[in-house]
Amino acid sequence: MGLKIAVTVKPNAKKAQVVELAEKQYRVAVREAAQDGKANQALVDILADHFGVAKSTVKIIRGHAARHKLIEIG
């Protein structure tokens, strides 16, 4: 079982970034629109890069179609 974090996603952002709001709580801005899973894929890519893990280890547990998501890393 890996690290679980709460993430609020901001799609269509000018700049992609990860901001830690509190322990295990993040706000992630992605440049992609929330259409056809593009923002979710961008979220996985950004979090994998931020935490230094493979993309395959980052999973969306809850909130596939919502801005507030539960992510498992590892």
Language model regions located:
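N-terminal first-folded block
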Residues: 1-29
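Arg/Lys-rich, often Gly-containing low-complexity segments of ribosomal proteins
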Residues: 12-13, 33-36, 40, 62-67
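Short secondary-structure boundary micro-motifs
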Residues: 1-4, 11, 34-36, 43, ...
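C-terminal structural segments of small proteins and small subunits
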Residues: 4, 44-74
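Compact, glycine-rich, soluble single-domain proteins
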Residues: 21-51
